[in-house]
Amino acid sequence: MSDGILSFSSKNDKRGETSGKELITPSSQPVDDSSEVVSLRPDRFESYVGQTDTVETLKIAIQAAKMRGDCLDHVLLHGPPGLGKTTISHIIANEMGGTLTVTSGPALEKGGDLIGMLTNLARGDILFIDEIHRLPKTVEEFLYPAMEDFAVDFVFDKGLHARSHRYRLKQFVLVGATTRVGLISSPLRDRFGIFRSLDFYTDEELVTIIRRSAGLLNVVLDDGAALELARRSRGTPRIANRLLKRVRDFSMVRSSGEVTQKSVAAALSLEGIDSKGLTVLDRNYLRTIIEFYRGGPVGIEAVAATLQEETDTLVDVVEPYLLKIGMVMRTSAGRRASVGAYEHLGIKHQMELF
């Protein structure tokens, strides 16, 4: 396998994979695929919390495919980072009984990288491409016949001597994940039979996830601690699990080991996370709009330049949650800070000065 590719298996076969979700090729391992994080992932839809409509849609589609003895339609998942797109791909593989191969758009630099993976897939296997919007155009074009006809076309020689050969693939399921669905070309997007957008989780859903993760990590926490942690997790399970570990460490060193609401507040204060889950970068983003650009409107490139941050970081990581809770507004003229942003930062709104 080429760099950037991981293989997992949910069945026994003769290709070297083992049962369960054991890591086979660790090269270029994604940051959220450490052994502890993987252990916190639910492996069936029955234990998956949140995204009710998406889960129901996939359960129906999977059951129908099994009844027909057919493969599942290709799936495209859209949403901010950390909402469960990779986890859902693992669950789809488990539910369908296929082997999961994980890669990402930037890792597939040449058409040969993709073709090598496609030709190694068995019937019913799942290929998960994270950040699919970052696929090079030349690689993306190989996906069109692969998704539609389960075939890839090879061209030999050039000019008058050019010859084309079609290689038949086994039927597979492509699961694509993206944070920027608008950057996916229409020909690729239209080839997905199932398209679902994932939304931020409610505090109640996050409390359930935190309690499950705490049990797996042998962490004792009370109701107030679970709710406080949920409120500061930006509606994102990945962040909730990460903060739970930081709070666990803090409680082990600075208190009796039991996680309380007070220890959550103290631990996350050290992390620079406030009562609404805003990080230092979030607050600097809002302060930049308010103090440097008088509340906006201002273009995202100008904000990124002032903060010395990548524009994609602000668009993909910072803005989704701030938009969700109404701290910032996107207008045709640019970004504008809301009254709520002024109040949260303790800054007097400009309109009140006159």
Curated annotation (Swiss-Prot):
Q: Does the keyword DNA-binding apply?
A: yes
Q: Which reaction does it catalyse?
A: ATP + H2O = ADP + phosphate + H(+)
Q: Where do the annotations place ATP binding? A: 40-41, 82, 85-87, 148-150, 191, 201, 238
Where along this sequence does the record place binding of Mg(2+)? 86
Q: What class of enzyme is it?
A: hydrolase
Annotated DNA binding lies at: 330, 335
The main place the protein resides is cytoplasm
Q: Which locations, inside or outside the cell, does it occupy?
A: Cytoplasm
Query: Keywords of this protein's UniProt record, alphabetized?
Result: ATP-binding, Cytoplasm, DNA damage, DNA recombination, DNA repair, DNA-binding, Hydrolase, Nucleotide-binding
Q: Where is this region: Large ATPase domain (RuvB-L)?
A: 2-201
Small ATPAse domain (RuvB-S): annotated segments? 202-272
InterPro entries referenced in this protein's UniProt entry, alphabetically: AAA+_ATPase, AAA_lid_4, DNA_helicase_Holl-junc_RuvB, P-loop_NTPase, RuvB-like_N, RuvB_C, WH-like_DNA-bd_sf, WH_DNA-bd_sf
**Cellular component GO terms held in the UniProt record:** cytoplasm; Holliday junction resolvase complex
* Biased composition regions of type Basic and acidic residues, renumbered to the chain: 11-20
Q: What is its EC number?
A: 3.6.4.-
Region (Head domain (RuvB-H)), start-end ranges: 275-354
Specify where the region named Disordered lies, as residue ranges. Answer: 1-37
Q: What does the record's free text say on domains?
A: Has 3 domains, the large (RuvB-L) and small ATPase (RuvB-S) domains and the C-terminal head (RuvB-H) domain. The head domain binds DNA, while the ATPase domains jointly bind ATP, ADP or are empty depending on the state of the subunit in the translocation cycle. During a single DNA translocation step the structure of each domain remains the same, but their relative positions change.
- Family to which this protein belongs: Belongs to the RuvB family.
Annotated function: The RuvA-RuvB-RuvC complex processes Holliday junction (HJ) DNA during genetic recombination and DNA repair, while the RuvA-RuvB complex plays an important role in the rescue of blocked DNA replication forks via replication fork reversal (RFR). RuvA specifically binds to HJ cruciform DNA, conferring on it an open structure. The RuvB hexamer acts as an ATP-dependent pump, pulling dsDNA into and through the RuvAB complex. RuvB forms 2 homohexamers on either side of HJ DNA bound by 1 or 2 RuvA tetramers; 4 subunits per hexamer contact DNA at a time.
- Protein name as it appears in the record: Holliday junction branch migration complex subunit RuvB
Q: What species is given as this protein's source?
A: Desulforapulum autotrophicum (strain ATCC 43914 / DSM 3382 / VKM B-1955 / HRM2)
